[in-house]
Regions:
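Helix-loop-helix module between adjacent transmembrane segments
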Residues: 74-82, 107-123, 144-161, 214, ...
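Membrane-interfacial loop-to-helix junctions in multi-pass transporters
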Residues: 26, 62-68, 95-107, 137-146, ...
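Hydrophobic alpha-helical transmembrane segments of multi-pass integral membrane proteins
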Residues: 97-130, 338-354, 365-404
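Membrane-core helix-loop-helix motifs of multi-pass transport proteins
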Residues: 130-237, 435-467
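Cytoplasmic juxtamembrane regions at transmembrane-helix boundaries
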Residues: 85-107, 231-253, 413
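Hydrophobic transmembrane alpha-helices of multi-pass small-molecule transporters
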Residues: 1-76, 199, 206-336, 340, ...
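C-terminal transmembrane helix pair
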Residues: 133, 137-154, 368-479
Length: 479
């Protein structure tokens, strides 16, 4: 088959991908270097005493321990639900809908974005499972482009959805340091808090009509872009062309009654009623929280999201044995979070305790106006996200000065959380950190898909700057 001739934009993306893979280190060295850089700024620029800086860093290392566990559960829970047999069967039926390669890539892109809005962990794995099913069914489908579409939810709308880290942190008590809550609260006439407790519920972030409009625009634009760049005919390289085996491994998640366990303890592990009962209790607890909340949006926190995923995992996998195996398969994907989040906690503590956040807020205030502040933060968030590829931990670093400057510019604080999220997601299109779990499942390398994701980023980045500017102008202060 003739090798397809790439366009100028594709050639540029491939060159940039090769440079990034050759010269940029993994995410962990960035966290280590970031620790040293912030410590140096705290000591040199802010004049913080070395003993105080050391104590601040040491205390901050474990400040994100609850959040680290919650984010790990997002990854595990999303994976467990996406790989459950009933979901897998539904995915196979969905893969039977498209008839052409272009229809298949657009379907996968839309599925990735919409499912990632509900949960980024589920969306990432769900889209990957769908991509493999599509590649088996649709002839002449370019596997590289198809694989890249599985990442588009994480590169566009995920942070504007129900698992958006920054929005959930702002809405969940105890998920941010008290110093950050104080900054978010602000001070009004007479010293009263402008935002009580510094808590910003989801109705003021992801459920703003402006946020929902931004999500809808991104989905439409990206779907149209994917349709336009999908290689057809001789330009396409299928999974077979790339030497990738799409056959499914034997499914060992189903219990076989005829050779089931005999001892009582093992018998209990394979009883479907037990898992279904616990799953039902979990879903009932979530519904109770939603019913009792003053606003439904205010009740959707990391805890409720994770409880929902856990309950669905029990219900869909039925028996405790099946669920345990699903969790065991999903757990390795969380090691990066558990390793890096303590470092980010230490960085955040140094930034706030040294008043470095106030210095950066001064810079952002001086460099922007109320109209230009949102696009400035979106661009800065995207740039920093290339080097710190974690929306939640990066928000801990950015929140102090982003929110402080928002008060000074008198812009909507909830919208600035959404602005941060929209910018942060773009970074996932240009660096491979969050691509790794999916690429392993699809049998590809980062360089195989980043030409497509870079192409999407070139369109999405200016679109985001336009959206945050135009939609932000319709909102008042403080919420």
């Amino acid at each position: 088959m003739t090798e397809p001739t790439p366009s100028r934009l594709e050639r540029l993306a491939l060159r940039m991908t090769a440079l990034a893979e050759r010269w940029l280190p993994d995410a962990l060295p960035f966290a280590l270097l970031g620790t040293l850089l912030v410590a140096g700024l705290a000591l040199g620029l802010q004049g913080m005493a070395p003993a105080k800086a050391l104590k601040s860093w040491g205390d901050g290392v474990w400040s994100l321990a609850p959040f680290s566990l919650q984010m790990a559960m997002v990854v595990i829970g999303g994976t467990v639900v996406a790989t459950a047999p009933p979901v897998a069967r539904w995915v196979d039926r969905l893969a039977g809908l498209p008839r052409t390669p272009r229809q298949a890539t657009v379907l996968c892109a839309v599925a990735s974005m919409t499912s990632s809005w509900f949960n980024w962990g589920f969306g990432l794995l769900f889209a990957a499972v769908l991509a493999r099913a599509l590649a088996r069914r649709v002839a002449g489908l370019d596997y590289r482009t198809l694989a890249a579409t599985t990442l588009l939810g994480l590169g566009t709308v995920w942070a504007q959805g129900l698992s958006g880290s920054a929005a959930l942190q702002m809405a969940t008590p105890g998920m941010l340091a008290p110093a950050i809550r104080t900054i978010a609260a602000g001070k009004g006439p007479g010293g009263a808090e402008l935002v009580p407790g510094g808590i910003i519920s989801l109705e003021h972030t992801i459920f703003l009509w402006q946020s929902l409009a931004a999500v809808a625009v991104e989905i439409v634009v990206v779907a149209a872009l994917v349709a336009a760049i999908t290689p057809l005919g001789p330009r396409a390289r299928t999974a077979a062309d790339l030497g990738i085996d799409l056959s499914e491994p034997s499914d060992d998640t189903h219990d076989r009654p005829h050779d089931g366990p005999r001892v009582p303890g093992q018998w209990l592990e394979h009883q479907g009623w037990l898992g279904r009962l616990i799953g039902a209790l979990g879903l009932a607890a979530v519904l109770q929280q939603l019913w009792q909340a003053e606003h439904v949006a205010a009740a959707i926190t990391l805890n409720t999201v994770n409880l929902t995923l856990l309950a669905l995992g029990f219900w869909l996998h039925k028996t405790p044995a099946r669920l345990a195996r699903a969790f065991a398969r999903a757990t390795p994907a969380t090691w990066g979070l558990l390793l890096q989040f303590p470092l980010y906690g230490g960085i955040a503590a140094l930034i706030t305790d040294s008043k470095l956040s106030e210095r950066v807020a001064d810079w952002l205030t001086a460099a922007a106006t109320p109209l230009t502040y949102p696009p400035l933060v979106a661009a800065y968030s995207a740039l920093l996200g290339v080097f710190v590829p974690s929306g939640g931990s990066k928000w801990v670093i950015e929140a102090p000065y982003v929110l402080a400057a928002a008060h000074r510019h008198r812009v909507h604080l909830g919208w600035m959380v959404a602005v941060y999220d929209l910018g942060e997601a773009v970074a996932n299109l240009v660096q491979p950190f969050w691509m790794l779990p999916v690429l392993g499942l699809l049998g590809l390398r980062a360089r195989d898909v980043m030409g497509v994701t870079w192409t999407v980023a070139l369109v999405v980045a200016p679109l985001v700057l336009l959206l945050v500017t135009a939609l932000g102008a319709t909102l008042g202060y403080p919420l």
